[in-house]
């Protein structure tokens, strides 16, 4: 159960990072994007907690290590593969987390995955100063 839960958390963080990056690239405010997403069906813990607390302010200090998240994603993929689960989405999630681990190191916070997406998109997802 823990592996399934943490895989869903990893998937939510990765997908939310890409979705918000697309909006920022299109000129949207990432804080407002989170507010709108959180009022709809796309809401998840990345948009309700991780982005507002760690990504938008740029602190990247949510308190869960990159190495721990990648370990759980790897274990989930191994177990799911052993059960014959197709894993089209799972492999993609695993790939982006492995990339984030390589870029930011095992001691980094797992929210730094957003930096990997930012780098690829050529943007930053920070709260706009008022």
Whereabouts are the PLM-identified features?
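Interdomain hinge/lid region at the active-site interface
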Residues: 8, 49-111, 117, 129
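Segments forming oxygen-rich coordination pockets for charged ligands
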Residues: 16, 95, 125
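Helix N-cap / loop-to-helix initiation motif
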Residues: 27-30, 86
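Beta-strand segments within the central parallel beta-sheet cores of soluble alpha/beta enzyme folds
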Residues: 31-39, 91-95
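Residue-level marker of structural boundaries
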Residues: 42-43, 98, 122
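Extracellular cysteine-rich, disulfide-bonded domains and loops characteristic of secreted proteins
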Residues: 116-124
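ATP-dependent carboxylate/acyl-activation modules
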Residues: 124-130
